[in-house]
């Protein structure tokens, strides 16, 4: 019977840790971008899970305008047919859109464009999350 050496044990622990991290990482994906408009923080993010996705744009001051435009892609797990859905919204301080995959479908990707305009300045960013 083979003995487990200290070096082999370390390799085994490393492989198991990486496998666990990759498995957990596949369950949710998040991408966020951060900037500033007139000294206040602007953040845009996209999040995706197996059957849902969401995107948001936030601004640290309740003035000006903010928006998020998102396209969500999904695939039918039986027919492999693909589909997309698009949503847009705009307001002050914080905006949010969410999507749910249709029956027998799972998420593929969400792409979002974020925009904050205030005090004569504009911040834009794109975010993509993939399942």
Features from the language model and the residues they span:
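N-terminal prepro-regions of secreted/extracellular proteins
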Residues: 1-50
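Post-signal peptide N-terminal regions of Sec-secreted extracellular proteins
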Residues: 31-131
């Amino acid at each position: 019977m083979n003995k487990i050496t200290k070096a082999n044990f370390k390799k085994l622990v490393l492989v198991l840790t990486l496998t666990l991290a990759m498995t957990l990482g596949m369950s949710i994906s998040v991408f966020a971008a951060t900037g500033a408009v007139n000294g206040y923080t602007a953040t845009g993010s996209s999040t995706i899970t197996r059957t849902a996705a969401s995107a948001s744009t936030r601004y640290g001051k309740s003035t000006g305008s903010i928006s998020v435009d998102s396209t969500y892609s999904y695939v039918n797990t039986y027919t492999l047919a693909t589909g997309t859905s698009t949503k847009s919204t705009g307001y002050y301080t914080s905006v949010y859109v969410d999507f749910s995959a249709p029956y027998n479908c799972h998420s593929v990707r969400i792409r979002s464009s974020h925009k904050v305009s205030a005090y004569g300045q504009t911040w834009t960013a794109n975010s993509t999350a993939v399942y």
